[in-house]
UniProtKB/Swiss-Prot annotation:
Keywords for this protein: Electron transport, Membrane, Mitochondrion, Mitochondrion inner membrane, NAD, Respiratory chain, Translocase, Transmembrane, Transmembrane helix, Transport, Ubiquinone
Statement: the UniProt record of this protein carries the keyword NADP: no
Presence of the UniProt keyword Membrane in the record: yes
Gene Ontology biological-process entries: ATP synthesis coupled electron transport
UniProt similarity note: Belongs to the complex I subunit 4L family.
Any one Gene Ontology cellular component term annotated for this protein: respiratory chain complex I
Official protein name in the record: NADH-ubiquinone oxidoreductase chain 4L
Catalysed reactions listed for this entry: a ubiquinone + NADH + 5 H(+)(in) = a ubiquinol + NAD(+) + 4 H(+)(out)
Gene source species: Nyctomys sumichrasti (Sumichrast's vesper rat)
Oligomeric and partner information: Core subunit of respiratory chain NADH dehydrogenase (Complex I) which is composed of 45 different subunits.
Cited function: Core subunit of the mitochondrial membrane respiratory chain NADH dehydrogenase (Complex I) which catalyzes electron transfer from NADH through the respiratory chain, using ubiquinone as an electron acceptor. Part of the enzyme membrane arm which is embedded in the lipid bilayer and involved in proton translocation.
Any one GO molecular function term: NADH dehydrogenase (ubiquinone) activity
Enzyme Commission number(s) of this protein: 7.1.1.2
Length: 98
């Protein structure tokens, strides 16, 4: 494993730990998820450039599409929660509340 891949793996792990630790605010969770998607994208690009199989070339584009969809849904959810409740706490996302 090269130093670049090791650093990206560490960044992914830190983003995952941030997602698990800072679950109170939706905005911090979304930022950590975007960091994870960025690390996955960079790892996919480096892997596809190193190995050169033709099947790996569209995978970074697919990851970018999923990251854009995740960001759009996350921001829509953040706007809905903050306009409804006035805060971005994740505990407000419980739909079973009366």
């Amino acid at each position: 494993m090269t130093l670049v891949m090791f650093n990206i793996t560490i960044a992914f792990t830190l983003s995952l730990l941030g997602t698990l630790m800072f679950r109170t605010h939706l905005m911090s969770t979304l930022l950590c998820l975007e960091g994870m998607m960025l690390c996955l994208f960079i790892m996919a690009v480096i892997t596809s450039l190193d190995t050169h199989p033709m099947i790996m070339y569209p995978i970074p584009i697919i990851i970018l599409v999923f990251a854009a969809c995740e960001a759009a849904v996350g921001l829509a959810l953040l706007a809905m929660v903050s306009s409804t409740y006035g805060t971005d706490y994740v505990q407000n996302l419980n739909l079973l509340q009366c």
